[in-house]
């Protein structure tokens, strides 16, 4: 029989989910059920509330790390051996195995991950409570000359707790990777898969980038007033039109607008869809295009795009929003307009803005990998580049903005042809069409190059003129 001492293990919490979770995981471990590898790699002995579960788990994990997966009677004997000569405790462990772990509660394979998460979360909360008690207890005991060292020590302790909450991603063997690549290579050979990621809506650009790929950070940089927001909206349109990779019934695009209200973003998208700038159109002419506007509005109504407009937003808030939407939808693309308006923290700290922007770009890259989604972030360039003889943007123009240049997988610059050019000046005066170059200055996984566009600013529309792959003059 199981002793009263061991029964306390099952009654340690009011939350019956935690109690059941620990039991189920122990059962899976002892019975070598499907999912044991996840249990042994994600959890630690301290994640279980107390003896004997933590002791059983430690024994199993030590043998697992040495290449021996023990279960059933073999695991029981290993546990008893570690207990040495404590015969009373050995008998209690035997009773636990016989009465609970080798019989006990039924469970399904899909339950394992859920119960692992329950146990891990409960463990983190226990550790945080213990950490808080420790800090409170030491409040008046730390001497002034040791305060900085004390702060460093508690920061390290806190960081260890937080880091233990994250699951390590299992590595893939070459065999597993090759299986995926073997399916792709014939398609590439036949020309069926020139674009691996989500389409931008511009064929020449997709030929350079292979599309917006999962886990990548793409930065679109330009001086103020060069059409960054308009281009991002064009990218949204291109993504939702990608019928091969975007399912309007399941997928969603997220747009974080820090400069414009959500209504302004919608208006620009409506102008793009309808090709009508209704805010500047006379009432008489508007009557002629009214049906086009209504039709375009109906198209946009059904698009799975969520716009978050903030005057300021922190990294934690961006992550929280992506997490929340991911619970019910498949997030295919995240767009941020623009990067330098994001705050790393809710409160200001004693760090430079350059350091903060570095934290932001590194975190956005981390989010892209964590959520397995491409993130496109606009970035603003200083007007000082106009002082150069050749005002075409280059990568070093981003260096004053932290480590954007290093963190981004792709960097695209919007460069408007010199306004003093007579042809372009005439266009500016007549129909708001500007000649611009979209320069792919950095591409970690492919060629660089440029695509020439006509940018019709009054209806937020980019149209391809021509493109030049593999470099430019």
Swiss-Prot record:
CDD domains reported in the protein's UniProt record: DnaB_C (cd00984)
Substrates-to-products reaction catalysed: Couples ATP hydrolysis with the unwinding of duplex DNA at the replication fork by translocating in the 5'-3' direction. This creates two antiparallel DNA single strands (ssDNA). The leading ssDNA polymer is the template for DNA polymerase III holoenzyme which synthesizes a continuous strand; ATP + H2O = ADP + phosphate + H(+)
A single GO BP: DNA replication, synthesis of primer
Keyword Hydrolase carried by entry: yes
The protein's enzyme class: isomerase
EC number: 5.6.2.3
GO MF terms held by the record: ATP binding; ATP hydrolysis activity; DNA binding; DNA helicase activity
Binding-site residues, ATP: 222-229
Coiled-coil portions: none
GO cellular component: cytosol; primosome complex
InterPro entries (alphabetical): DNA_helicase_DnaB-like_C, DNA_helicase_N/primase_C, P-loop_NTPase
Gene3D superfamilies, sorted: DNAb Helicase, Chain A, P-loop containing nucleotide triphosphate hydrolases
Residue span, SF4 helicase domain: 191-469
Keywords, sorted A to Z: ATP-binding, DNA replication, DNA-binding, Helicase, Hydrolase, Isomerase, Nucleotide-binding, Primosome
Domain of life: Bacteria
Keyword Hydrolase in annotation: yes
Pfam families per the UniProt record, alphabetical: DnaB_C
Function: The main replicative DNA helicase, it participates in initiation and elongation during chromosome replication. Travels ahead of the DNA replisome, separating dsDNA into templates for DNA synthesis. A processive ATP-dependent 5'-3' DNA helicase it has DNA-dependent ATPase activity.
Homology family: Belongs to the helicase family. DnaB subfamily.
Subunit structure: Homohexamer.
Name of the protein described by the UniProt record: Replicative DNA helicase DnaB
């Amino acid at each position: 029989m199981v002793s009263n001492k061991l029964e306390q293990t099952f009654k340690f919490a009011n939350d019956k989910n935690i109690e059941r979770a620990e039991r189920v995981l122990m059962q899976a471990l002892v019975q070598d059920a499907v999912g044991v590898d996840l249990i042994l790699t994600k959890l630690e002995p301290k994640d279980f509330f107390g003896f004997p579960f933590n002791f059983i788990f430690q024994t199993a994990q030590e043998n697992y790390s040495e290449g021996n997966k023990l279960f059933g009677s073999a695991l029981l004997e290993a546990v008893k051996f570690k207990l040495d000569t404590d015969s009373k405790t050995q008998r209690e462990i035997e009773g636990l195995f016989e009465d609970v772990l080798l019989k006990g509660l039924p469970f399904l394979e899909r339950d394992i991950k859920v119960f692992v998460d329950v146990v891990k979360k409960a463990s983190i909360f226990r550790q945080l409570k213990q950490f808080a008690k420790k800090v409170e207890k030491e409040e008046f005991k730390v001497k002034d000359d040791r305060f900085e060292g004390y702060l460093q020590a508690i920061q390290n302790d806190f960081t260890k707790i937080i880091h233990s909450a994250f699951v390590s991603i299992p590595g893939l063997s070459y065999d597993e990777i090759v299986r995926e690549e073997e399916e792709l290579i014939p398609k590439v050979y036949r020309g069926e898969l020139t674009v691996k990621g989500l389409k931008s809506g511009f064929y020449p650009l997709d030929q350079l980038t292979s599309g917006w790929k999962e886990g990548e950070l793409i930065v679109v940089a330009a001086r103020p007033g060069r059409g960054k927001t308009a281009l991002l909206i064009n990218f949204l349109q291109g993504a939702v039109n990608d019928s091969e990779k975007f399912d309007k019934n399941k997928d969603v695009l997220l747009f974080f607008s820090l400069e414009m209200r959500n209504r302004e973003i919608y208006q620009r998208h409506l102008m793009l869809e309808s090709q009508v700038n209704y805010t500047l159109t006379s009432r008489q002419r508007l009557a002629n295009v009214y049906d086009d506007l209504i039709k375009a509005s109906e198209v946009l109504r059904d698009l799975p795009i969520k716009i978050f407009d903030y005057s300021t937003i922190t990294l934690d808030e961006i992550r929280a929003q992506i997490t929340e939407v991911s619970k019910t939808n498949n997030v295919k693309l995240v767009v941020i307009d623009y990067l330098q308006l994001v705050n790393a923290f809710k409160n200001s700290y004693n760090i430079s803005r350059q350091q903060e922007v570095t934290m932001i770009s590194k975190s956005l890259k981390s989010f892209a990998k964590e959520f397995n989604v491409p993130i496109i972030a606009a970035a603003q360039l200083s007007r000082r580049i106009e002082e150069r003889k050749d005002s075409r943007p280059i990568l070093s123009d981003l260096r004053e903005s932290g480590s954007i240049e290093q963190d981004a997988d792709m960097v695209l610059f919007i460069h408007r042809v010199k306004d003093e050019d007579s042809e372009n000046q005439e266009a500016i005066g007549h129909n708001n069409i500007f000649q611009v170059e979209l320069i792919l200055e950095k591409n970690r996984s492919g060629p660089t190059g440029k695509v020439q566009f006509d940018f019709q600013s009054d209806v937020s529309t980019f149209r391809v003129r021509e493109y030049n792959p593999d470099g430019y003059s």
